[in-house]
Amino acid sequence: MKEKHENWSHPLAFWLCDCAAIIPNPATQNFAKNDFLDGLLMLNLMKFINPHFSENEKNGQSLYEELLNQISQFYEKNLDQVIVCKMPEISILESSGEIDEITFEELKKLLLLLLGCAIQSDHKKVFVDRITGFDQTIQAELAACIQKLTESDEIVQNLEDFERRKMKETDEVGGGGGSIEDVDSDDMESSTTSSSNGEIAIKQQDQSFLMSRSTSPTSELRHQTLQIANLQHEMRQMRTQAENRDEECQKLELDNEEKAQKIKILENERLKLVDFKKKWKSVNDDLQEANCKIEKLQNLVGIEKKYREARDGKELYKSKYDIVVKKNLEMEETITTLEKNLKTLQMEMKEKFGVEDNLQRMRNTIDDLEAEISKKNLEIEDFLDEKHRMDREIKELKEIVHQMEVPSTTTTPRIMDSLADQLENAKQDEFEMMKAEIRKLRAQTEGATPETTIIQCNQDLDTLRSQLSTEQHQTAQLHLEIQKMQVEKEQIDGNMERIGIELEEMSAQVENLNLERDEAVKQLLEARRKFGEFQMGQSRDLEEKWSKEVEKSNKISKKCEILEEKLQESDFLLAKSRDEAKKLQFELDEALEETSHVTRSLSSEKNTLKAKLLELQDQVEAQTLELLNQKNCGKRLEDRDQMISNLHNLKNELENDLKTCQTQLELESKKLQRLREDLVLEKSRRADLIGRIHSLCTTLSLNGANFEKINNDDELIDNIDDIMMNALVAVKRERDDLRIQGNQQIQELHDLKRDIEKLRRSESESLNESDDRVRELTRENMHTKEQVFMLQEKLRELNLELSTKNDEIDMVKASIEELNRNSTASCTSNAEIARLQVSIRNSQIQEDLVKQENTKLRDELQEMQKMSKKRSQNLDELENMHKTLLVDHSRLQQLHNLLTRDYDEAKKESMELRQKVQNIPRQQAVFMNANIRELEAKLSEEISRREQLEKEHKMCRIHCENLRRDITELVQTRDELSLELRRAHDTCHNKNNQIDELKKQLNQKISEVNKLSSKIEALSQLNRTYNEENRNLSRQLEILLTQNKELLQRALHDKDQYHLEMKDFQDQLSALRRHKEKLEDKIMDQYRTMENKKSTPERKQPLVKRAAKALINRRRATSNGGSTTEDSSVYSADERSSPPLAGTNEDVDHLPPTCSSSDDHDVISPDFSAKNPLLRSRNDFMGGSVRSPRRYGNDHDGHIYTSPFLPPRVPIRNSPMTSSLRSRPPPPPYNRSPAHKIEQNSSFFEPIAHSTPNSSILEERRVVGEGEKRELVRDKEERIDKTLSYYENVNLPQNPPDLPENSDLKPNESTIWHEYGCV
């Protein structure tokens, strides 16, 4: 039962029960609480809310389903909103017959949605009026529910916001799916060959898809959007607060009006009660007097004395009248003094108004002076223009004069007094006139030089400036005086208001005194009339009527006692008491008339006694009245003194608060101006640096660098860093290539030496063969000379490129340092601006925000220090690389010297062999011709290969053109994004202006609220004065004050709740940031697992021809270059089609495949820019050029280095300018022992005799000594296969005998590379 009672006491259930009276349907008016779960009442309420209610004609649909459909349609059609929260479960509502906790929670959801429909419908006023009539607790809880619906997005959202969020979610899901599809497509393409044109087109489509993918917004844009959202939320809250305050003010005004009306009614009742009390007192006094008179009438003694006392009483009354007149005169004098004070105050006000008029006049004069200054400036500009024009005219005249003064060279003899002479004379006269005018103009110009005019103008300007400065100083002083006068004016206005209130009180007092005076005069007249009547009726028969009068007096006394008891017991029955009092007055009048007749018969002594008694009673009453008046006046004076002291204290406190607020506002405005200036400077510096970086990027892109879409400056810097590191890697690879070439040449020289020794041994047997062999050797020697020369040239080029790259690295380092400084400065400035904004909005939250920002700044500083350490480490690594390059250069020079010596020795030996081979017979010439034919056939094959390579080169050109188009499109997209950024900045600025305007409006409303609060305080003061007079009114005022305190406590509680909500939002933001970082890490992990197209090398040629073709430098057709005829020897179709060695992605990601030229590298090699630029494994064979974070370094060291491709060959450089731009991966590591050995690779390994020098077949062979014959001479094809390559793979059998047929072993999964040679 308690739970049911608590459920029905819930505000939403109470509201629904109250709404049953509004609905016109009669079935709902007879509503019972047991029928709550039927749903009829809620459905009828929805019909009342929505006039366009459309009932569904479906038979199987329940009432709750129909109700929910109508609610959702109402939100969508009328309010443009969507219900986001979890809808109430209809099965629970229909199944449960009684109201449990679960069913009531579902009903709460439904009632909440119904309340939102009711408050936002056309019948809004009806529901609001009903809600305002509830208790305060229910009102507060219903208001919280309404705020949940209107302000938060947990229950209901706008359609536009909902659609935007859905679009964002679909975009994010589509972007992730596209990246996965790219990975899958790359995996599929890695398993197939990449030599055909169709596969190149597919790769272009993939690249265009990746480039066209929408980029994620930058951190600055996200920060700006978050700031805008926070500002909008604050705006909404401020609006709701302002509306709530306006409503509260209206309610308070209505309450005050009602209370004022009640106070007036109570005052009227109090006055009536006071009058009734006075009359009752007068009746009691009359009764007592009558009793006294009756007692005194018994004693007929001293009648003469009474007559005398009556005379004295008249004199006393006269004296009292004089006293009252004097009091009236004193009051009139006080009124005159107050009127004088009023006049003085009015005079002061007039003087102040005159001062204000003077100020306005001064302002007008200042405006006139500014207008005159502007006119004078315009006149000065006109004068300067005229001066410039006069100078031009003078120059033109000077030129004309100079032309006129030039003597004519052709002098022809003419006849005197002829027409020609006359014309010449006329011309001369005109020239003289012109000269005279020119002289005059010169004199004028010399008399009024431009310097004098400029000096005069400058003097005038100085005077005007001095006048302006003085006037500005005067205006500043006047402004200060005006402010002071305004403060004094406000003080005087306050004093005037107080004086007016006091005057009103004094006027009320004067009116009361006048009324009292009139009443006293009336009483005197009535007393005289009664006294006369008493004297007239005294002569009648006292003895007859004495018994009757005694009886009547006894009755009257009894009746008075009964009336006294009734008045003490029942104060509420005033009407009855008034009627009884009237009856008593009538009876008393009759009794007085009768007693008057009795007293006439009495003697004068009784009259004297009566007069004395009356005088004494009047004196006592006058003294009591005076005492009461004095007490009231003292109390009033004390209250007014307290009021004045309190007002003075309040005024002083307000003045101090104003001063402190003004100082704080000035300081904050100065800080804001400084911060804005610093921001402008930092933005300009940042823009300059970004421009420099962009220019550097353009130069790098012209030189062949590839850039992706740049979203941030940090990404741009990272791209530049990657390009520099790639360049260094390329230099390293070239160094390795040169080293390999040197080793190849040394090996060839050793082969030549062996061949020469063989020739010496077989001089007698093969003289004819040696002649052809010598020719071949001479040709090879020529080729070696050319190779040495080319090596020297390449070394020089490398040195030059190294120097230029070092300079570029230094420049980039400087720019990166400047960017880091600017970024730190911008971060600090943004943080300070945010702090200032938060301090202006909420002074209580300022300290917490400052602490949080300090922690953030410390973290940022630590991150920057870590970044600087990393950069210093990178610099050290670059220096080490430079040193190693120098050492390699010295070694190459030594090798070059050794080669020259060997070449000289070989030359001498060839000369000796020529002398010996002259005697060789001609029979072996036929054999040599056959060899020549075979070589020609090989040449034709190479020519066909060259044609194929040319075709591939054309395809590469087409691909380069497509890439250029993509770059132009990227530039256009970047421009569009920059425009959008500017627009976003403009919108932010406009919104800031709107916020400032709303703040101004808020300040105005706060000032109005303060005025209203001051009025309320004045009313409360009046109420206090009335409370002192009446205790009941004081109790009511205390209740009002307690209600006020409760409202203030609620407001403070709401502020605390708002503060907690802000903290929750900040925590949610931090959680979102962490989630974002985790997502970025996951994306980077996906990018690391991506596989690129791989290609396998073709069958290799003999060593000598391959080395010769690798070292011949041929010009490329385009700037990017393509492959030449020598590239055919690098990669074959077999190398491209080789499957991967292992099934995992980690084994493949270490080494990308190499290519024959830079264009093939762009097509086939992996896109390093697509990977994370920070991932470079330092422990790898690449010499620390690839960076990797600490968490990935250990994973790579533990695995065996395996690659699905053949090792690199000697690349061919076609031109010295583009040789440094082509990057090749280094060869595989030497003598590297893997940490984890795979058992499959070791168990199924079977070496081949002709490929591995460590085989068991070759161990049995021994080296043939001098003078001995070989047991076995290899065929020519076998020798060619031997010298084909210095790296070859050993393939396993596809199905070993030990393994079963259904095993999952791949054909090339456990291949192992063996190396031999002299590298």
Swiss-Prot record:
Belongs to the CCDC88 family. GO terms for biological process: amphid sensory organ dendrite retrograde extension; ciliary basal body organization; ciliary transition zone assembly; cytoplasmic microtubule organization; cytoskeleton-dependent intracellular transport; positive regulation of cilium assembly; positive regulation of dendrite extension; positive regulation of dendrite morphogenesis. InterPro entries: CH_dom, CH_dom_sf, HOOK_N. Residues 141-173, 218-690, 732-1096 form a coiled coil. Keywords: Cell projection, Coiled coil, Cytoplasm, Cytoskeleton. The gene is grdn-1. GO terms for molecular function: dynein light intermediate chain binding; microtubule binding. Disruption phenotype: Embryonic lethal with few malformed larvae that develop to the L1 stage of larval development. It comes from the Eukaryota. It holds the Pfam family HOOK_N. The C-terminal domain is required for localization to the cilium basal body and role in ciliogenesis. This is Girdin homolog. GO terms for cellular component: centriole; centrosome; ciliary basal body; cytoplasm.
